[in-house]
Every structure is written in C-alpha cells, then in structure tokens.
Amino acid sequence: MRIIVDAMGGDNAPESAVWGGALAAKEYGEEVLLVGKPEIVANVLKEKGLSDVKGITIMPANDLVDMHDDPATVLRRKPDSSMAVAFKLLKAGEGDALVSAGNTGALLTGATLYGGRIKGIRRGALAPVMPCANGQVMLCDAGANTECTAEMLLQFAFLASLYAEKINGVVKPRVGLVNNGTEDTKGDPLRKEAYALLKKAGDEGRLNFVGNVEGSMVPLGACDVAVCDGFTGNVQLKTIEGVAKFMSKEIKGVFMASVGTKLGYLLCKKGMDDFREVFNQDKIGGAPFLGIAKPVIKAHGSSNEIAVMNAVRRAIAYTKSGMIDAVKENIQYMTVE
C-alpha cells in the first residue's frame, strides 16, 4: 500500500508533514510518497534522522497551495503545487490514499475532481471525529457543503455510519439529526424532510436512527454520528473547540490564583493531564472526505508530526476497510427518486 502525503501543506509544513509521514512509514510498514520540493523534504528527513527509513519516496513538486489561495481555481493555476501533484498521483493509481493538512477547500475540490465521487453520491462531506461524554462522535458534514438537500443529509448519515462502523469499530452507530429540538415536528423544511427520510431508513433497519438531537446533546454522547449541513456542522465544531479552549484557560486561571491553589494543582495534575488528553486531536489525526471514490484524509492545518502520522494511520485503515465498496453496495438506499 502507498499513502501519498502532501509534504508542503499545513501551517507547520514541511517539517511536520515530512516528519509525520516518515514516522508513519517506519511505524506502520507501508510505503509513503512525500510530495514536495525534493531538497527541502530530504533536508527535513536528514535533520530528523529518518533518511534511511524504508518505504519513503520523494515525489517532486516545486510549488505549494497556501491557505489564502482560491480553492476553486488554485489546482489549475498551480499545477506543480504539492497538492495538485499529489492528486494527480492518486488519480493515476500511484498511491492508494492521500493525506494533507493544506487548504480545506482546495483539498475538497481536488478530491472531487481527481478522486471522483462514488456513483450516486451527490456531494462529498467532511466528517471529523470529536470527543464526547462516552467516547467519540462523528460530525457529518462539518463544512464542505453549506447548502444541502434532504437527500444529501440522508447520504451523509449512511456514509458516516459506515465509516464509524468499519473504521472506528462502532457497533450499530446511533445516528442523530442535529436540530433545534428533539421533537419530530421541529426544524425548518429541510430538517423535517431529512427527518422523514432518516426515519424511513431506520424503520427499514438500514440505519440506527435515534431522532433529532440538539447541539448541546452532541458532546454529551447522544449519538455516534451527528448529521447536519456543512454550515451547521462547522459552527458546531468551532463552538466545541472554543468551549474546550475557554475551559482550559479558566481552569488554569483558577489554579494559578494563589499559592494554595497552585499546591492544589500539583495534587490533581494527573487528572488535569487526563482531562486535556480528551481534547487532544493529535491522536485522531484527521478527518475523511466521505463519498469520494478514493480515500482522502484532511489533517488539521496546525497538525504536528504526531497528528500527521495518525492521519496516515487513518488513511491506511480507510483503504483496508472496504468501506468504499460498502457504500456502492448500499447506494440504492441513499437515493431519493
């Protein structure tokens, strides 16, 4: 298996991308193609003492996509960028999956253009995993599609449910529709129509649909898959991230207030470290673009080498899972005539 890594994508690239990709090749024994400026990639490998790791191939690309580039046009304007070259390699079958911490919009555009959507899937969706009260919850869509149809929400539910089952190991994932109330009469016309489609799929045993869930219920573990349009999902995701940072800052302020509270912190430091670890995204690695015919993983823009390594691990698991074939087998239940 060969995993393509965009070595120049992300806030901490090329160091984190090259380092993480090389660590993944060493740890998981799969071949990793590092796409970027050869001399820069080689220098990072040398600095980290990873030049001799087996399974690493440097693929030349002399430009890069930055976070301010127009997602819709950048891959055409910058054909020699690391992301564009990475997608060309994926399309040509030179690699089995792609990992990038680069521009999210450009990555989704490239995934659709070069990877292609699975036949019958209307739109690809970004599906990050977030911590919740009883483990993890997958949010789908988290920003790829700001405007959706009810059929798209139905497809997001199937895609994320299959991923949660086959890659995350969740048995009969509970699917909830993010809404402004739990009653089946709640929501705007889109949510009401989507609810009817999801309930039908649940009644037929195709999905484990648990009904509407409010935004506050998502981090409390009300479902394993939270289905929403990309606008709602992105707001939900950023709100949870903001609350986590706020809590961390406030707790630190309380413990640093006096000598007594500082001593108290020393007594519960282990517990605080465990609390922070719950929100550690490095161990998750990245979020998949679901509905695409080839695995594409979006690592966080600020990913360090551990996050990139785990994004590669997730790409390997995705490739081995048979999920894309499972989507094709179930596509008849995801379409509305």
Language model: regions and residue ranges:
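Phosphate/nucleotide-donor binding subsite
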Residues: 49-95
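Short beta-strand segments
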Residues: 6, 35-36, 59, 100-102, ...
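N-terminal phosphate-binding or glycine-rich loops at protein starts, especially the Walker A/P-loop
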Residues: 1-42
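Glycine-rich phosphate/diphosphate-binding loop of Rossmann-like nucleotide-binding domains
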Residues: 15-16, 28-33, 38-39, 146-215, ...
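Glycine-rich phosphate/nucleotide-binding loop
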Residues: 112-126, 131-139, 222-226, 230-337
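Short, glycine-rich nucleotide/cofactor-binding loops
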Residues: 3-15, 144-154, 298-303
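Short glycine/serine/threonine-rich phosphate/pyrophosphate-binding segments
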Residues: 12-17, 80-93, 97-111, 118, ...
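Glycine-rich phosphate-binding loop
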Residues: 89-108, 186, 191-193, 197, ...
